[in-house]
Amino acid sequence: MQLFNGSVHTCYSYRRHQYEQSEEYLAKLQEEEQVKGVFGRYVDADLSTGKIRDYEIPLTWYQKYLGGRGIGLRILLEEMNGDEDPLEEDNIIVFSVGPLQGTGVAGAGRYAVISKSPKTGSLNDTYAGGFFGHELGTSGYDGIIIRGKAPKPVYLSLVDGKPELHYAHSLWGQQVVDTENALKEKHPGVRVASIGPAGENLVKFACIISDRNRAAARPGFGSVMGSKNLKAIAVRGGIQKSLHDAQMLAEVRKRLVQELTTNADIVAFGKGGTASCVHVFNDEGLLPTKNFQEGVFDGIAAIDAGTSADFKKLLVGNDNCTGCPVRCKLKVDGEFKGQAIQAAYGAPEYETLAALGSNCMNDDIAGICYANQLCNAYGLDTMSTGVTISFLMEASEKNLIDEKINWGDAKAIVQLIEQIARREGIGDLLARGVDYVAKELGADFAMHIKGQELAMHDPRGKRALGISYATTPRGANHMEALQDDGAENLGKYGTPEIGVYGPIDRLAWKDKSRYCKKFTDLGSFSNSAIVCTYIGWDGVLLMDYNPYPRIREALYATTGLEIGVCEMLSIGERTFNLLKLAAAQQGYTRDDDKLPERFQEPLPRGMSRGEVVCEELLQEAIDDYYRLRGWDRLGPTDQKLSELDMTEFIGFIDRKA
């Protein structure tokens, strides 16, 4: 097949007969009435050859893994052998949605991206909100599989059910807002997920940005897209799913919105979003400060959206995701040293305020907002960026580098972001990630786990978080972790899903392995259903609200699958074990479940003064966690896989080796 033989704008020819075959398959799937709410297929685009086909999903995969993360991981374990380099053409990247995307259910305006991570070297996943996920959920497909590497920059459009590849030469080098504007002009009504210059330049922690300010961040998938010469994906849907019970779904949607808009905790959260939570962690003495050397930041009053007068002057409103009345995404407008801060890029979330603020000793809120804007424009993960810069500041303080980079220097932070994205000067070194930089400098204070920079949560005052950090195959990821401070409310609000019937002391080790497993399974289920963190498990943790009965009702109305509490947790456990199987394939073992040595240093002040992670107690808890999981030192045993109805993976781990 000859490349670039289409029109001026279309790189690869469009093969209609493939879609006719898929339409017959889709009709058959819906006639069988076994699983509604799905299209039963993914776009499968090979950028090396230019061929686009449909990838049909077995019904049993939906029944076992539901969607989102689960289906994406199952595809990759089917199609990859583990030898792939994350930034070479044999890696595969999957954009995936679940049954609820495209239905308008509050909290379901999200999508998943799954691939082999240049940060951890294993399969990993990330999520973003906004409107792209909803559009993909009405596209006629449940996701998009990208293989190979295009000979020239391209983008993929999926408009009215028809996927096509187009030249993207004019878009290469553009920041994400410019890319989005150009694609919306060319394809009216599309939603766009794209990379900026950081992804093009293969920065290890480059991310994917959709809707201008929603980041699919952490594992470095912006660089995976860049390595494939894939600039963007533009989707316009409008294709309705076949629902099990449309009337019931409408009633559940209405009831969920009513509950969200009348819950005082959720309404308050919507006004300030995560940016109003910074002081909470500071009060606990657990706000990452000075590269995690401290847990209290003296400049806290300047960077919390709820307390900072300067922050409030920058705020210009709130934004939402598809179908969600909470509207927790803040917008800012202003300037930093003569540079415009634009509302289109959104306000910094908690993680960004900590990573580029307190952890760098930076209390210049305008500087943080502008740094956040640059990260979104260039397509950089703000957490990894902040952790890497704070490491550099400490290295400078300890005279490990020639450059003088002072703590709290907002201007220097902005300059370093520019250098990282463009891979200029010292930015070329930093672009490789904090683990690489630490090895080059011979430093032992890099804050990462399995190559992934730390999230902005300190396990010295959260025992279950430490277990999760150490054991998750995702690296230093907090998004499925039990946040012990929030768990002190679990008994108050009641959470039968994870077997909690009384208050949990954040500093106690007792039962934390069990809580960690249950909560991780709950979060893993949420990531297969793809429901918002803050309506999902954070609703359980932080607010007087348990959304999971409504989520299960919505899934039944959509799919016809009766998912009780036990099956909900089983779906989560299955999908989490897919991650563990992939990690075992890459050689990860029980020996790799470690935390940075800094967490054995006591916090110097604040409510958590003197707290450390006791290595002996942590290792005992991890042993208990492995026992509860049914894992040996390599991963899930064959007995556990059989219990989870994952018999196709028996023998997947080579225990003889």
What role is predicted for each listed range?
Residues 22, 184-219, 225-657:
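Extended C-terminal regions of large enzymes
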Residues 22-222, 227-301, 582:
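Protein-protein interaction/assembly regions in multi-subunit complexes
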Residues 15-16:
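Basic polycationic patches enriched in arginine
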Residues 3, 19-21:
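Cationic, low-complexity basic patches in intrinsically disordered or flexible, solvent-exposed regions
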